[in-house]
């Protein structure tokens, strides 16, 4: 399956996402903020297939992370998670960079389906 980096500062939601994606057999790395996620991306030399990140996080938010990841690791698909309508609008300004923006709350099946779709190669 895929190598996925999950950046989420909320412990409960992060655990839910990890559980859902583990069920699908993905190899996961977790980070609690954007700086830690960017460090993981740089350390792994872009071996990740997908960056799944929350938009609103401390230290570095998901938008800044997506911009840095897209610039430095263009082969990594990017998917954003947010519970805030204004953040969804802001994220949709990144359409060329971000594969999808998923609205919180979401079910296990919704996140699994969105990840499966994000992992389909874009042309």
Model-derived segments and spans:
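Two-component/phosphorelay signaling modules centered on CheY-like receiver
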Residues: 10-29, 118
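C-terminal output helix
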Residues: 18, 106-118
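Acidic, metal-coordinating helix/loop segments flanking the phosphotransfer/catalytic sites
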Residues: 30-50, 71, 89
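Acidic catalytic/metal-coordinating carboxylates
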Residues: 33-36, 61-65
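Active-site T/S-Asp motif of two-component receiver
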Residues: 53-54
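Receiver (REC) domain active-site loop signature in two-component systems and cognate sites
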Residues: 57
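Alpha4 helix (beta4-alpha4-beta5 surface) of REC/receiver domains from two-component response regulators
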Residues: 64, 84-102, 109, 113
């Amino acid at each position: 399956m895929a190598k996925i980096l999950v950046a989420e500062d909320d412990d409960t939601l992060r655990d839910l996402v990890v559980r859902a994606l583990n069920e699908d057999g993905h190899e996961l790395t977790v980070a609690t903020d954007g700086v830690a996620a960017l460090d993981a991306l740089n350390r792994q030399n872009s071996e990740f297939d997908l960056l799944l990140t929350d938009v609103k996080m401390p230290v570095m938010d998901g938008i800044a992370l997506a911009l840095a990841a897209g610039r430095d690791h263009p082969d990594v698909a990017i998917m954003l998670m947010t519970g805030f309508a204004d953040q969804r609008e802001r994220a949709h300004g990144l359409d060329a960079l971000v594969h999808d923006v998923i609205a919180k709350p979401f079910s296990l099946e919704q996140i699994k389906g969105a990840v499966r779709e994000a992992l389909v190669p874009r042309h």
